[in-house]
Curated annotation (Swiss-Prot):
Segments of this protein annotated with the region Dimerization: 90-141
Name by which UniProt lists this protein: Ferric uptake regulation protein
GO cellular component: cytosol
A Pfam family of this chain: FUR
GO biological process, one term: negative regulation of DNA-templated transcription
Keywords: Cytoplasm, DNA-binding, Iron, Metal-binding, Repressor, Transcription, Transcription regulation, Zinc
Chain intervals for the UniProt region annotation (DNA-binding): 1-89
Function in brief: Acts as a global negative controlling element, employing Fe(2+) as a cofactor to bind the operator of the repressed genes.
GO MF annotation terms: DNA-binding transcription factor activity; transcription cis-regulatory region binding; zinc ion binding
InterPro entries (alphabetical): FUR, Fur_C, WH-like_DNA-bd_sf, WH_DNA-bd_sf
Primary localization class, coarse: cytoplasm
Residues that, per the record, bind Zn(2+): 38, 86, 95, 106
Organism of this sequence: Brucella melitensis biotype 1 (strain ATCC 23456 / CCUG 17765 / NCTC 10094 / 16M)
Subunit details: Homodimer.
Length: 141
């Protein structure tokens, strides 16, 4: 049921849009491209300073804002925590948020997508955009 998707590399696209790709921006883009999780700005900062200790938290915030404005990343404001980020991709997916650990799991289900379309259509609507976030607790063994 889970379908893999690839995260695009936005560096070239940002250059075409006139955005200068500085070392901190490249490091942050690489972090987002290589990560499997949805880090917050502080976690991105921690990972960035491992590569270049001259990067400041302010630089991370400014870069994240720029990347969000350019459509290179998505900001998620999951309940109960700081904004989390992921590199934008063309493939739609939904999220399960583990309420105990805060972990975010991406998934795609054709069955859920079809049901949402059927419901919208039956009520006289066409889905333009949607976001599904399931807040869950792990099953006990």
């Amino acid at each position: 049921m889970n379908k893999p998707y690839t995260k695009p590399d936005y560096e070239q696209e940002l250059r075409r849009a006139g955005v200068r790709i500085t070392r901190p921006r490249r490091i942050i883009l690489n972090i987002l491209n290589e990560t499997e999780d949805h880090p917050d700005a502080l976690e991105i900062f921690r990972r960035a300073v491992e590569e270049d200790d001259s990067i400041s938290l302010s630089t991370v915030y400014h870069t994240m804002k720029l990347l969000e404005e350019r459509g290179a990343i998505h900001r998620h404001a999951f309940a109960g925590g700081p904004s989390r980020f992921e590199q934008a991709s063309g493939a739609h997916h939904d999220h399960i948020i583990d309420m105990d650990s805060g972990d975010v799991v991406e998934f795609h289900s054709d069955k859920i997508e079809k049901l949402q379309e059927e419901i919208a259509r039956s009520l006289g609507f066409e889905i333009v955009h949607h976001r599904l976030e399931l807040y869950c607790k792990k099953l006990k063994s």
